[in-house]
Amino acid sequence: MPHAESYDYIIVGAGSAGCVLANRLSADPRCSVLLLEAGGWDRDPMIHIPLGWGKILTERRHDWMYFCEPEDNVGGRRVECARGKVIGGSSSTNAMAYVRGNRGDYDRWAATGLSEWSYDKVLPYFRKQESWEGGANQYRGGNGPVSTQFCRYKDTLIDAFAQASVQAGYAQTKDYNGERQEGFGRLQMTISKGRRASTASAYLRPVLKRPNLTVLTEASATRIVLEGARATGVTINHRGGERTVLARKEVLLAGGVINTPQLMMLSGIGAQDELAAHGVQTRVNLPAVGKNLQDHVSVILMYRRRAPGGPFLRNMRADRIGFDFVKTYLTGRGFSGDVPGGVVAFLKSGPARPLPDVQLLFTAAPLAAWPYFKPFKAPFADGFATRIVATQPESRGAVKLASADPSAAPLIHQNFLASPKDWESLRAGFRVARDLAAQPSMQPFIEAEFFPGPKCQSDDEIDEHIRKTSITVHHPAGTCRMGADAASVVDPQLRVRGVDRLRVVDASVMPDLVCGNINAAVIMIAEKAADLIASSKEGRAVQ
């Protein structure tokens, strides 16, 4: 890296959004781009083998190791908040589900004054990002960087669960990322030839040889350099040494929902009273920074499976799965090239709901399988699970500084289940999951419900199960809210209010959560941001 450390664009965070920005901005050979990543390269085979996701998640490999603050609504627990700390960010560590959200999510954004973020306006960026196995149509893209496909995991239990949804009278959808989201359908994944299709593999790796793109790993941003009301660079800690890199055009924050507001506050951009409490000088009084935190909270229902069990149990013996991991990693073909999912649903908990507020994720495997492997025999009884997710949460939390030390984790106040409607969504979804298990097609597979168990029946008992066991499904958003109003953190062009040459491009700009997993939406935001940046001269602040 040359001594004159200045670039046209500095991107902070090589995650779901940052890798997209690096690709699109460096496509102009006249622009120099620096991409900073606090983690390392994505060399771990477990990242790339889809079934390795279980170990990535439970062992929290390549993770920031964040935990939420204790909260009464979840029994005083500190719920873990997994965030990817590796090239590709959470797109390298997530469960690979590909869900865009509902048309109504984006039209709701537009109704607040964000007219350029309506469904019709963002659809081209969803199409641009993907290469859908079914080919291009008016909703789907056929030539984008991210390969998307239906989950190909095969198990008769998955077919039985899909049939149960028909027997119970629920609506069906052939493509929840197409014309209609609501209903039961086959899960879609970001997998290509038996490997995870992260933004690192899809967007970044193909362009690493561009001479105008520099990537620094193990480089943590500690402060945004401000000259008056203008962002001119970033101070970084790179492998133990601190230095400053300068941006001639813009600094682009893509560190994610937790790290982006933390960096802004450490740099003096935030609520004046909160910054003063930690001895941070206020440069821009922007009280909304870190506020509006929201996430998808979930609860699970698990069953034991009748003998002889399914393919997951048979293949998870250490001698078999070890061989299969190697085979899949080298050839892209094998049992490990998919995950034991298959069916997903987006449902309304009641007729008054304008959009689906419940997501069901069916898994043809017991959660007790995650701490694999023990030699030569499966260390768990076979089973399956349905995860119930509240997709339209009304509860709002905040990310706050714990100290002025950049190496200290911030305080994450999720404020889970603060709204009665969030409880209603989970409760309703729980009863739907039980209804599905009671259908005729499921009876040959069910030995017994074991979590929480058949004694959990009343609303109070279900609520206690939710309180004791609910977790996040790792879809945080909103902490640098985009809006047309002066109280928002960023304007509709993602420019930070009160600061020139500074934008936020990640899930923190979402005004509110979309219905479903958020990786596709974050990629869309980055694709759209790249066009906004390319069409902008300096990214001047909006007052």
UniProtKB/Swiss-Prot annotation:
Its EC number is 1.1.99.42. Its main location: membrane. FAD binds at residues 16-17, 37-38. Keywords: Cell inner membrane, Cell membrane, FAD, Flavoprotein, Membrane, Oxidoreductase. One of its GO terms (cellular component) is plasma membrane. GO terms for biological process: vitamin B6 catabolic process. InterPro entries: FAD/NAD-bd_sf, GMC_OxRdtase, GMC_OxRdtase_N, GMC_OxRtase_C. It is a peripheral membrane protein. Optimum temperature is 30-35 degrees Celsius. It catalyses: 4-pyridoxate + A = 5-formyl-3-hydroxy-2-methylpyridine-4-carboxylate + AH2. Its cofactor is FAD. The N-terminus is blocked. It is found in: Cell inner membrane. Optimum pH is 8.5. Pathway: Cofactor degradation; B6 vitamer degradation. It comes from the Bacteria. The keyword Protein transport does not apply. One of its GO terms (molecular function) is flavin adenine dinucleotide binding. The active site is at residue 475. Monomer. Involved in the degradation of pyridoxine (vitamin B(6)). Catalyzes the oxidation of 4-pyridoxic acid to 5-formyl-3-hydroxy-2-methylpyridine-4-carboxylate. PANTHER family: CHOLINE DEHYDROGENASE, MITOCHONDRIAL (PTHR11552:SF147), GLUCOSE-METHANOL-CHOLINE GMC OXIDOREDUCTASE (PTHR11552). Belongs to the GMC oxidoreductase family. This is 4-pyridoxate dehydrogenase. It comes from Mesorhizobium japonicum (strain LMG 29417 / CECT 9101 / MAFF 303099). The lineage of its organism: Bacteria, Pseudomonadati, Pseudomonadota, Alphaproteobacteria, Hyphomicrobiales. The gene is padh1.
